[in-house]
């Protein structure tokens, strides 16, 4: 067991103020959080004891939307319209990445997360196997999100990853998702919708990030991306939409109706 003592503890519970105390950890799970208990502590053989020296201990921050391995593209191209940035400066470089590249780049990003107090993320990228391996090797908590679109991954691969990695315990898990409406043809979206119904699973995706994205979807389908995705049954079990910069009142009603985060 591990003991962290002489700490100021913030639990984030509304009815509990910051207090002086200690934390006991066994088998990677917190067993005790409370006032210092020196009498009981002397009865235990500790693997490690850490004097927090009065510093604050609190739950780690959670980064709800990441593309960890994209750290290699930081400042590669700034101040560009979204679609030009993606098509000209992101997708061509991503196409050259190997699974090993993504493994090591994910570990690099995780090191940066940890230095900022981030202990968990929801990570959408290209190779779930190596992403999950990187997180487990770092002892970092990650939910990998499906990223299928017209040119990478497939509905069958998403289902295989879901069956392999989706679980309620452990450091890592997997959830259904796709990159975005504008990169994913209707046939694939319908396939993901069917998986959601089969597994009673939520779906996660980028949505309404730019005005041009919304306008192009309206031109193609007669609906905004949010309404179009609802029509395809993608929100029957909720989920999450990333960005949502350009949303109509009708879009917001969809979000409320399906309790989408």
Label every PLM stretch briefly.
Residues 1-43:
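N-terminal metal-binding scaffold of metallo-dependent hydrolase/deaminase domains
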Residues 7, 23, 28, 54, ...:
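Divalent metal-coordination and catalytic microenvironments
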Residues 9, 121-128, 182-183, 244-248:
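Short beta->alpha connector loops
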Residues 66-68, 126, 209, 246:
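Short, glycine/acidic-enriched loop or turn micro-motifs at the edges of active sites
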């Amino acid at each position: 067991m591990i003991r962290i003592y002489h700490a100021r503890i913030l639990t984030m519970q509304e009815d509990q103020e910051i207090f002086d105390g200690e934390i006991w950890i066994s088998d990677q799970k917190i067993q005790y959080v409370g006032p210092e208990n020196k009498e009981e502590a002397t009865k235990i053989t500790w693997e490690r004891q850490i004097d927090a020296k009065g510093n604050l201990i609190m739950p780690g921050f959670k980064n709800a939307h990441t593309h960890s391995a994209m750290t290699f593209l930081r400042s590669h191209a700034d101040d560009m319209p979204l679609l030009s940035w993606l098509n000209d400066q992101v997708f061509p470089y991503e196409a050259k990445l190997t699974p090993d590249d993504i493994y090591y780049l994910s570990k690099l990003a995780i090191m940066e997360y940890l230095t900022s107090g981030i202990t968990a993320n929801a990570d959408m990228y290209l190779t779930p196997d190596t992403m999950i391996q990187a997180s487990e090797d770092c002892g970092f908590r990650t939910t990998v999100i499906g990223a299928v679109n017209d040119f990478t991954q497939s509905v069958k691969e998403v289902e295989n990853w879901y069956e392999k990695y989706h679980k309620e315990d452990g450091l890592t898990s997997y959830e259904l998702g796709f990159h975005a409406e504008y990169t994913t043809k209707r046939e694939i979206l319908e396939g993901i919708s069917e998986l959601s119904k089969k597994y009673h699973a939520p779906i996660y995706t980028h949505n309404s990030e730019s005005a041009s994205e919304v306008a192009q979807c309206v031109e193609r389908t007669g609906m905004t991306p949010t309404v179009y995705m609802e029509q395809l049954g993608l929100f029957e079990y909720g989920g999450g939409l990333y960005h949502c910069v350009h949303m109509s009142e009708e879009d917001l009603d969809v979000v409320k109706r399906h309790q989408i985060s």
